[in-house]
């Protein structure tokens, strides 16, 4: 989004949610900062984990600034709602507004255009958690361990 965008916006969730609310927004803002791109607070909206919320937040953003050309959503579900709103306003994706989500959910592969997203290795992290839990049960030891799991950008048709 950063390479081809000029006017950025973000739809997230409450900061009470550390992973989705805080960390994803922090990551987005740090990428903008590293690329010397300013974003005003009024272009950062907070919604809920639903398509309806993504739709409503995108509607607010576009009414406030019709020239937004790049939108990141904290979840794919919210991004799908935003895409619906953007298309209903007669804008083209990605030509007028490029959109990306996070999560690599199944619906993102089915919509038109297909959603650019970030894939997390949930299966791998689940297996690692199960291994850690099994070790805890079998060894009766609470070994604290932090594992950082990687993610991958999945480029599809919703970005330029």
Regions found by a protein language model. Give the residues of each.
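Small/polar loops that bind or transfer phosphate-bearing groups
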Residues: 12, 20, 46, 74, ...
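Hydrophobic alpha-helical segments within soluble ligand-binding/sensing domains
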Residues: 1-10, 26-34, 51-59, 79, ...
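Short beta->alpha junction loops
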Residues: 43-52
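An alpha-beta-alpha
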Residues: 1-35, 145-160
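Flexible loop/turn connectors
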Residues: 59-60, 64-160
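Short, intrinsically disordered, charge-balanced linker/junction segments flanking boundaries
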Residues: 2, 45, 65-68
């Amino acid at each position: 989004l950063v390479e081809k965008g000029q006017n950025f916006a973000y739809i997230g969730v409450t900061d009470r949610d550390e992973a989705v609310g805080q960390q994803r927004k922090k990551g987005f803002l740090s990428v903008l900062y590293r690329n010397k791109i300013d974003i005003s607070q009024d272009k950062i909206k907070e919604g809920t984990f639903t398509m309806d919320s993504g739709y409503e937040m995108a509607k607010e953003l576009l009414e406030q600034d019709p020239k937004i050309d790049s939108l990141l959503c904290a979840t794919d579900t919210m991004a799908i709602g935003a895409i619906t709103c953007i298309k209903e306003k007669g804008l083209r994706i990605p030509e007028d507004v490029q959109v990306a989500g996070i999560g690599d959910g199944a619906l993102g592969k089915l919509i038109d255009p297909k959603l650019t997203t970030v894939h997390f290795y949930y299966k791998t992290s689940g297996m690692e958690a199960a291994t850690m839990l099994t070790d805890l049960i079998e060894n009766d030891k609470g070994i604290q361990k932090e594992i950082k799991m990687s993610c991958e950008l999945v480029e599809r048709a919703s970005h330029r």
